[in-house]
Swiss-Prot record:
One of its GO terms (biological process) is tetrahydrofolate interconversion. PROSITE patterns: SHMT. Its EC number is 2.1.2.1. GO terms for molecular function: glycine hydroxymethyltransferase activity; pyridoxal phosphate binding; salicylic acid binding. The gene is SHM4. Homotetramer. Interacts with UBP16. The lineage of its organism: Eukaryota, Viridiplantae, Streptophyta, Embryophyta, Tracheophyta. This is Serine hydroxymethyltransferase 4. The modification N6-(pyridoxal phosphate)lysine is found at residue 244. Inhibited by the antifolate drugs methotrexate and pemetrexed. The modification N-acetylmethionine is found at residue 1.
């Protein structure tokens, strides 16, 4: 049999130089590029160290103190520590809130919450995808095709933003809810640049007898730092990913109310919340098997980092940087949805320029700027959207401040101008447009400027001096 020292204690570069080389190339891409995808961030070396630890070896189906496998005494300690840190990071009273830290990521967390709270074909309402919502909130196309499992297994009716202002139309939301009578009302989104009126959501939910769930995946870091409105004041359940503005590993959490319910007309005296057992059962055994303990350990590290004064400074800077970028683009005459932002992202409406998000995303990719095409309210297709979504968390993690984001705005303006020039010369069809991207000196110059700019900032998670590909 092959000795352990041969297969089990040999470095990656020796065992699999091909994968090692691709990882090094990805490091270079991250270091030399400008990362503007709003759902991405750069996590810390400490988090990465926990992710690559021996915790990945252990199975631990069940919850601390009630496992289906032995040998979990330290895994139980880690998960309990992660849960207590999660409640502390989000300023939750442990007597009033519980949390499950086992979901593999945000979409599984959402579906586990729905499975716990609803019966198949119960009614839900979430923000429409072109209005800034998320697939898991019940999205289906204008033609009625059900895209998300949420819309397949539950009856979904979206609410929307006002097409003039870009803000959520709470009056129409209430009107729809009174007609539709959902069992669950969802607030939260993936491309909504404004804060959420949780008090209004609560009032609407109470009017129609619905539970209120917040998906704070995008803004959880801002919520933890108290730089965004607090969903825990009004919601019954709060879900989140952990790798976006929270700057942790890729994982998910479900927070739920527990203990006595506040007195309410028509409610039995002494009523208590019954979410805990339902949510724990939905996560396991209903939808998942063994938790990913390396993720839970890494999440515990990230939550410890999130509960520091330095993280609050970071979250505040994320918002300031997003505002600075939005203001710069508007100063150049570009159309920004809602005329600005109150959180970590800017949604740029390209339709007045006659461009699609696909083309701008593709050209930016070739210039080492990473952002994503995104639907804008009024779009008929998420596959050919009229905007791009731009986020501040990742580059803020590298130490950039407002003036740096104004420079990023200048790069983006150059990219859009170049996209317009190529479209004018080669045509609107994507196959024709792509021809203008080949051997383009202006594009090459923009890429060189972007990479020179980005390489001057530090990189979390790994040492640039130890990279294989430095140039």
């Amino acid at each position: 049999m092959e000795p352990v020292s041969s297969w089990g204690n040999t470095s990656l570069v020796s065992v699999d130089p091909e994968i090692h080389d691709l990882i090094e190339k990805e490091k270079r891409r991250q270091c030399r590029g400008i990362e503007l995808i709003a759902s991405e961030n750069f996590t810390s070396f400490a988090v990465i160290e926990a992710l690559g630890s021996a915790l990945t070896n252990k199975y631990s189906e069940g919850i601390p103190g009630n496992r289906y496998y032995g040998g979990n005494e330290f895994i139980d300690e880690i998960e309990n520590l992660c849960r207590s840190r999660a409640l502390e990071a989000f300023h939750c009273d442990p007597a009033a809130w519980g949390v499950n830290v086992q979901p593999y990521s945000g979409s599984p967390a959402n579906f586990a919450a729905y499975t716990a709270l609803l019966q198949p074909h119960d009614r839900i309402m979430g923000l429409d995808l072109p209005s800034g919502g998320h697939l898991t909130h019940g999205y289906y196309t204008s033609g009625g095709k059900k895209i998300s499992a949420t819309s397949i297994y539950f009856e979904s009716l979206p609410y929307k933003v006002n097409f003039t202002t870009g803000y959520i139309d709470y009056d129409k939301l209430e009107e729809k809810a009174l007609d539709f009578r959902p069992k669950l009302l969802i607030c939260g989104g993936s491309a909504y640049p404004r804060d959420w009126d949780y008090a209004r959501f609560r009032a609407i939910a109470d009017k129609v007898g619905a539970l209120l769930l917040c998906d704070m995946a995008h803004i959880s870091g801002l919520v933890a730092a108290q730089e965004a409105a607090n969903p825990f004041e009004y919601c019954d359940v709060v879900t989140t990913t952990t790798h976006k503005s929270l700057r942790g590993p890729r994982a998910g959490m479900i927070f739920y109310r527990k203990g006595p319910k506040p007195p309410k007309k028509g409610q039995p005296e002494g009523a208590v919340y019954d979410f805990e057992d339902k949510i724990n059962f939905a996560v396991f055994p209903a939808l998942q098997g063994g938790p990913h303990n390396h993720q839970i350990g890494a999440l515990a590290v990230a939550l410890k980092q999130a509960n520091t004064p330095g993280f609050k400074v970071y979250a505040k800077q994320v918002k300031a940087n997003a505002v600075a970028l939005g203001n710069y683009l508007m100063s150049k005459g570009y159309q920004i949805v809602t005329n600005g932002t109150e959180n970590h992202l800017v949604l740029w409406d390209l339709r007045p320029l006659g461009l699609t998000g696909n083309k701008v995303e593709k050209l930016c990719d070739l210039c080492s700027i990473t952002l994503n095409k995104n639907a804008v309210f009024g779009d008929s297709s998420a596959l050919a959207p009229g905007g791009v979504r731009i986020g501040a968390p990742a580059m803020t993690s590298r130490g950039l401040v407002e003036k740096d984001f104004e420079q990023i705005g200048e790069f983006l303006s150059r990219a859009v101008t170049l996209t317009l020039d190529i479209q004018k010369t080669y045509g609107k069809l994507l196959k024709d447009f792509n021809k203008g991207l080949v051997n383009n000196k202006d594009l090459d110059q923009l890429k060189a400027d972007v990479e020179k700019f980005s390489a001057s900032y530090e990189m979390p998670g790994f040492l640039m001096s130890e990279m294989k590909y430095k140039d």
